[in-house]
């Protein structure tokens, strides 16, 4: 009998837990377009409370949550300052231009951060030849640097720039719970300077579908209107929101196990192929390895052994740990590494 595959391509491949499936089967539902789904309402209230915001809105995806935030917080014809490799800039099909008529201004993000001084200078330089800056968007954790978390003081520095210029700060917090667990601080502290924040429940938290946008009550009310325009009303979606409630109650603290396993994996990669990865840079659940330091056929060799890994780009191989990868799985991966030689 063949062994089940070990899927390290992304933390989006997780499957609902038995507790989630029971909650989904028993969920009380209503029509959420009318605001009448009690499970969704509880889920939204719980999310807002955990992140210190007034209200929240459940939406089908993180991309939709990001785009709703930009549509409400950024003025048409203005500029949004963001990281050069931010999800909102690189992976959302120019939706900000299409939906919100805003221009994204990317900044270098080699270490996963935005330089507060550079943001401040750009915000000051806006003149009649340049668009006004209406929003700064950050991503915590920063996926392209393999889950590098923003520390509280780093977020605060960017928040101070936003405050000084009277502009909004938005946090794409798809993996904000990974950041909070890695840093040992409440998530609400990490997002306190931000007007609004989004998080996903379908990544490390293991729920099947959706993201939650949290922010001021008036903003969320307007975002609900734009959600409808984008076709994001999901009617009796309490059946999936129920899994999100279970995730918030029981899946956050266990992210520490994912982080520990990612570090173990990084140490093994570094030992097997020196220079491919620096283990001390692995703070959350992702390991990024330099492709040219690895065997050219590594992904194929792993796949032949039932182990799936992915890439961020042509230069970077990524391994993402999650709840469906346990210690025995990691040991199986490490043993497989031992049998693969570097060309």
Label each residue range with its predicted role:
Residues 2-305, 309-325, 329-341:
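Conserved PLP-enzyme active-site core in the AAT-like
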């Amino acid at each position: 009998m063949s062994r089940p595959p070990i899927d390290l391509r992304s933390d989006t491949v997780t499957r609902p837990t038995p507790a989630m499936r029971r909650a989904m089967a028993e969920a009380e539902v209503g029509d959420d377009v009318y605001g009448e789904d009690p499970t969704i309402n509880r889920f939204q209230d719980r999310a807002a409370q955990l992140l210190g915001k007034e209200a929240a809105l459940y939406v089908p995806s993180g991309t939709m949550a990001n785009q709703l935030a930009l549509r409400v917080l950024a003025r048409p014809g203005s500029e949004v300052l963001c990281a050069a490799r931010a999800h909102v800039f690189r992976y959302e099909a120019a939706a900000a231009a299409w939906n919100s008529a805003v221009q994204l201004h990317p900044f270098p993000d080699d270490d996963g951060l935005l330089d507060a001084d550079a943001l401040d200078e750009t915000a000051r330089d806006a003149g009649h030849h340049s668009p006004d800056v209406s929003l700064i968007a950050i991503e915590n954790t920063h996926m392209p640097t393999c889950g590098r978390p923003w520390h509280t003081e780093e977020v605060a520095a960017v928040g101070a720039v936003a405050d000084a210029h009277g502009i909004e700060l938005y946090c794409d917090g798809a993996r904000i719970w990974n950041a909070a667990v890695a840093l040992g601080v409440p998530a609400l502290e990490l997002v306190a300077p931000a007007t609004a924040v989004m998080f996903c429940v379908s990544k490390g938290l293991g729920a099947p579908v959706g993201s939650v946008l949290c922010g001021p009550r008036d903003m969320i009310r307007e975002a609900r209107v734009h959600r409808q325009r984008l076709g994001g009303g999901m009617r009796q979606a309490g059946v999936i929101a129920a899994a999100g409630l279970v995730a918030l109650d029981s899946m956050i603290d266990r992210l520490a196990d994912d982080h520990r396993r990612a570090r173990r994996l990084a140490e093994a990669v570094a030992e097997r192929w020196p220079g491919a990865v620096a283990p001390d840079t692995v703070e959350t659940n992702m390991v990024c390895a330099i492709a040219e330091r690895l065997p050219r056929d590594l992904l194929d060799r792993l796949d032949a052994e039932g182990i799936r890994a992915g890439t961020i780009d042509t230069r970077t191989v990524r391994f993402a740990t999650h709840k469906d990868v346990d210690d025995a799985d990691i040991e199986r991966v490490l043993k497989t590494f031992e049998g693969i030689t570097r060309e």
